[in-house]
Structure formats: C-alpha cells, structure tokens
Amino acid sequence: MSAQREKFFRMPKLKPFHAPDGWHSPGYLPHFDGGEIPQFITFRLADSLPQALLDKWREQLRSDDCYDDAALRKRIELYLDQGYGECHLRDPRVAQSIQNSLLFFDQDRYRLSAWVVMPNHVHMLLTPGPDQDLSAILHSLKSYTANEANKLIGRTGQFWQPESFDRWIRDADHFAKVIAYIENNPVKARLCTKPEDWPFSSAWFRKRGGK
C-alpha cells in the first residue's frame, strides 16, 4: 500500500474524551456537527424502510423518556440489510458512481477511513476537515450522487431519504469496531463471503493497495 493510502486508513488524533458540543436536530433525528472528530455516517434510499416503521420511529423520537437510540438503530440496520425497496444501489454503475463521489473529496473536505455501498444504503467513517461542516458535506454529497444516479437509471424524483444517521467516534477501540462493522456489512447481509470481495467498499479498495 502506498504511503498516501496507508495514511488514509490511520486513526485520526481524537480530542479529549467527552461528549462534544455541536448537537442539533433539523428534522426528527439528532445530528452532531463536531468539527474534526471522526463520524460514523449512514444514509439510505428514500424507499429503504416500510412506512409503518418510519411512523413508529417518529413516535418514539417524540418521547425522550422511552427513546432508546441503540435499539432503534439496531432495528433499522436489520431492515436495511434485508434489502427493502427497489435497491437502486445494486446497479454496479450506480454503486461505482457513489463510491467515486465518496473518494473525490477525501483529503480535501474530509478524511475517509472506511465505507461500503450496500444495495439500499451507504456507511461511511469520515473525519471532517478543518472548518468543514458535516451537514454541508452530506447535503452536497447526497445531492450530487442523487442526480448522477437518477441519470444513470433513467428516473426522476427523490433518491435519498433526507435524514442521515451520524455517530461520533469515542476512542480508538470504537474507531476499529466501526471499521469492522462497516466492512463486514456485505458479509452479514449475505452478499459475499469475505469483506474484501465486495467491490464497493474500503475493504476491497485496501486489499488492492488503494487502487
């Protein structure tokens, strides 16, 4: 692996261990804009979850007393891995276009440490660059990839669900676990037998020396 690609997968230097400032809630998911702190991001296709589940999700988020973020995330991940919806990202042209877009701003707007493009969702582990706003990064990325994907498959209309999940990385152990989770997602979803066999992922990319 080249020195540049090796640097690409190193753990960023974390700030002191504490829950950082920067939380906001523009929709019905809490989000975190915390500067140069690694973030685990998930965004998904507009039709990737049943409406009944979305309604239940919104209701849970209205009640601070009963909302269990970890349990809700686990249930949503389970639904995503079942491949609900049209799964436009199964099209290799679309998946490759999205992967290219993720890599385009690496080392510029953010530092990308891991990613995977699944049939109906995308996982990323990134660290925003200096003075880069996470919400702006995701808005730009999702807007561009939606337009390109719609062109490739000859459709119009909403492509991504507006809301995204983001979770800040606590420490080096958490960082390593998130990379493993992201890269094993295709195996867990029974799309391949080894992480490096999935072509739209950091595992595949790293196995081939970052080429």
PLM feature segments, named:
Residues M1-K211:
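Short catalytic/metal-binding and nucleic-acid-binding patches
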